[in-house]
């Protein structure tokens, strides 16, 4: 699989190009989800409103506000996976802080297996046990001034949900509609990623815990503490 390398306006960000090719891109298979500005993805979970998730790493809590108002499918997918216990025990398989703080990425279900080859982490996604296929969700980004998110494509407009410090967003392959379960925390303001990756919430408490995450650390537990009633599952 060939990765698309973003073009940067400043030479000082060139190092990020190489990082992006392996950190934010996953090894997901190409998506079959159609691109659309006004889709009706009835087969995917959806969050109507907001919810709160507490993710515990090495005994310390991280509180995340998940935003279904501006990213209903992306937020719904994450909340559903949290509720299913998918993230419990998973590893942060890539953490990049040098030469500048970048991301802490986790959520590959393969990382639950301590014998899984570390070099292959970052290639996995959530396999729906009923359908026995990987659940893929569309790239979902809401531009400022728009009533609804855009789907299946990157945008040049400023999004409502930006990559500020503490943002949580979905990792994906170079195919826009290929996110599944892998996510990342922004360890700095990463505005050059805006419009290309789907932010769906922010850390509201415990950013110091996020800043201490090391590669290889595991998620003890993630649980929905507020707003579960706002999660709408496919019928």
Task: Report residues per predicted region.
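Cross-family detector of peptidyl-prolyl cis-trans isomerase
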Residues: 2, 28-235
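Bacterial N-terminal signal peptides
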Residues: 15-26
């Amino acid at each position: 699989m060939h990765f698309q390398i973003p073009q940067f306006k400043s030479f000082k960000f060139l190092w990020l190009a190489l990082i992006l090719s392996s950190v934010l891109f996953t090894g997901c298979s190409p998506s079959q989800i159609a691109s659309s500005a006004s889709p009706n993805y009835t087969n995917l979970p959806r969050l109507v409103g907001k919810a709160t998730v507490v993710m515990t790493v090495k005994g310390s809590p991280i509180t995340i506000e998940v935003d279904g108002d501006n990213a209903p499918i992306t937020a719904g997918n994450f909340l559903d996976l949290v509720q299913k216990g998918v993230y419990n025990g998973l590893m942060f398989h890539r953490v990049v802080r040098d030469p500048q703080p970048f991301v802490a990425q986790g959520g590959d279900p393969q990382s639950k297996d301590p014998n899984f080859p570390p070099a292959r982490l970052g290639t996995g996604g959530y396999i729906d046990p009923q359908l026995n296929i990987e659940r893929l969700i569309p790239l979902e980004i809401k531009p400022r001034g728009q009533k609804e998110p855009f789907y299946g494509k990157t945008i040049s407009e400023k999004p409502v949900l930006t990559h500020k410090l503490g943002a949580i967003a979905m990792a994906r392959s170079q195919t826009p509609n290929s996110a599944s379960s892998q996510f990342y925390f922004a360890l700095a303001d990463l505005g050059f990623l805006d419009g290309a990756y789907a932010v769906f919430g922010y850390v509201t408490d415990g950013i110091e815990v996020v800043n201490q995450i090391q590669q290889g650390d595991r998620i003890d537990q993630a649980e929905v503490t507020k707003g579960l009633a706002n999660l709408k599952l496919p019928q």
